[in-house]
Amino acid sequence: MAKYDEKKQLKCSFCGKTQEQVKRLIAGPGVYICDECIDLCSEIIADEFQETVDFDPKSVPKPNEIKEYLDSYVIGQERAKKSLAVAVYNHYKRINTNKEDIDVELSKSNILLLGPTGSGKTLLAQTLARFLNVPFAIADATTLTEAGYVGEDVENILLKLIQNADYDVEKAERGIIYIDEIDKIARKSENPSITRDVSGEGVQQALLKILEGTVASVPPQGGRKHPHQEFIQINTSNILFICGGAFDGVDKIIENRTRKSSMGFGAQIQAKHEKDVGSLLKEIMPADLLKFGLIPEFVGRLPILVTLESLDKEALIQILTKPKNALVKQYKKLFELDDVKLEFDEKSLIAIAEEAISRQTGARGLRAIIEDIMNEIMYEIPSDNRITNVIITEEAIKEKKQPRIERVEEGKIRPTLVKARTKKDIESA
């Protein structure tokens, strides 16, 4: 009997649960571990291993695999996703090939994304980096100035990438840098300026070397260089640079060029506004970028031109509901954590999309529109435990009325929606 009591009191050395409270208890020299703690340890190790797995250039995902992943997060832009998938595949294939002793050296191909505000340029670059599991950094071209002037040096872009790679320079040298608002560093006129343009042409000149591939000296703490500090040496030859911008006004340059080429006898007569901006951007040529204000050397280092289209109403509705990180899914989850069910009726989604189009903000403006409606109700829910359902209606969007709210009877509280879930439940959600 004493032996039975002793066995009954055996406990897990990690969580303290007794043998009766768990399925299995495994003994070691003076210690015990239960099946639940083993499962938990396995999950922790698996998660950490997943986070630390480095990208192997030898196992580059195929273009269709890259596009399939982009489809999960980015709605529409089929042409842009295919172009990006092929460009990224070729870039990392080049890294692997150039390591070997071959007769042909493959040149670097950076990417220029052109598209209206809110069309998904930044999201495409972020999603690519996440899929490839490579370090990623975003820089704003408007903050950059030529060396010696107030503002950020171009080397600070590389520092962000090194920091995101946990100062592993070798890992950073296979990363992706996205430079946003690149159209804002266009020079003020097509002709070279006599006066110094430190935030336009000067920045383009400063970016040339790192875009092409060079060993750059980066100050580890950022800021300006001075002769008494040590530098981090990083080779930019294998860093993929993706530059993006709205390029407002370049459509008129394209339109003027195409109109001139179609003049003369037998030319087809087109309505003045027959083509939208997205259709015109598809016809862009390097010469149009030169007229816009980019210098020839800069355009030459961005040989792959990828254009994005303006998002129409149907695309915006899909963006609200379809992707894994869709805004509607995010807000439903936030409400569920407070045991409240959130619904959007079909007309409300149409109204949100129409409002985003009228604001000319594209997908970027969707969150701001929803947040305006949600703010008041999200303030009330935590302190009103009778609210069970919230329905967002068309009137809530267009007329700024309060969403339709359903409550339980006086004296009762709402039932719990959130239940304890296993890791399997979370993964399948």
UniProtKB/Swiss-Prot annotation:
Lineage: Bacteria, Bacillati, Bacillota, Clostridia, Eubacteriales
Gene name of the encoded protein: clpX
Family annotation (Pfam families): AAA_2 (PF07724), ClpB_D2-small (PF10431), zf-C4_ClpX (PF06689)
Family: Belongs to the ClpX chaperone family.
Function: ATP-dependent specificity component of the Clp protease. It directs the protease to specific substrates. Can perform chaperone functions in the absence of ClpP.
One GO cellular component term noted in the UniProt record for this chain: HslUV protease complex
PROSITE patterns according to UniProt: CLPX_ZB (PS51902)
InterPro entries per the UniProt record, alphabetical: AAA+_ATPase (IPR003593), ATP-dep_Clp_protease_ClpX (IPR050052), ATPase_AAA_core (IPR003959), Clp_ATPase_C (IPR019489), Clp_protease_ATP-bd_su_ClpX (IPR004487), ClpX_bact (IPR046425), P-loop_NTPase (IPR027417), Znf_CppX_C4 (IPR010603)
Keyword Zinc appears in the UniProt entry: yes
One Gene Ontology term from the biological process aspect of the record: cell division
Record-linked SMART domains: AAA, ClpB_D2-small, zf-C4_ClpX
Positions of Zn(2+) binding: C12, C15, C34, C37
ClpX-type ZB domain mapped to chain residues: 1-53
Annotated keywords: ATP-binding, Chaperone, Metal-binding, Nucleotide-binding, Zinc
Gene Ontology molecular function terms on file: ATP binding; ATP hydrolysis activity; ATP-dependent protein folding chaperone; protein dimerization activity; unfolded protein binding; zinc ion binding
Keyword hit for Hydrolase: no
Binding site for ATP: P116, T117, G118, S119, G120, K121, T122, L123
Subunit structure: Component of the ClpX-ClpP complex. Forms a hexameric ring that, in the presence of ATP, binds to fourteen ClpP subunits assembled into a disk-like structure with a central cavity, resembling the structure of eukaryotic proteasomes.
The protein's name in its UniProt record: ATP-dependent Clp protease ATP-binding subunit ClpX
